[in-house]
Amino acid sequence: DVKPDINKAKVRYGTVNKEYGFRLATTAPADDGPIWMVNLMSYRAKADYADGREAEYSGKEADDRYAPLGPLKAIGAQPVFLADVDTQFLNDTPKWDRVGIVKYPSRRAFIEMQSRPDFQELHHHKEAGMAETIVAGCLPMELPPLPADAPSWADVPHPPTAADPYVVVVHVIKFKDDDRRDEMATYTDHAAKIA
């Protein structure tokens, strides 16, 4: 059984929210369950290893070497979405290069993975590649149903094709305060009708 030490958690590409990490690590098994970790990633132009080794590849290439698929599989986690950012439609900063979402079987599994030797063997590549990242623990919301008269792909002016496929829009929202969450539900309902 791997016992992570949240107080030792430190990375060069962001600030670990130790309070949140502690909550994840100590969630009672009866209250724990799947969690989706959304990763917003911004890369260094050139990989920068902490041990001083010279790297002749980009931060993105270093992150590709990190890709912890083995440790994820070992704990029962699975990547469910991975995409390079084509265009950042709103706000220029921070600039995100890639978005990834991983479904973990539990909060505890996410925290305990950080201490696994097979994960730690790869992590220096992430440290070298990332300029900045945000990792947010998320739980899916129930999507509003599509209206009965929603058009099919065949009925829209520019349907997706093999040469010009559909676009996935990732909309990350930061609330000013918790009292505004009801407004977000209203926005989501209206956006679903328009989309």
Predicted regions and their residues:
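Short S/T/G/P-rich N-terminal loop/turn motif that feeds into the first structured element of a domain
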Residues: 1-97, 108-112, 136-195
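Short amphipathic alpha-helices within nucleic acid-binding modules
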Residues: 49, 105-124
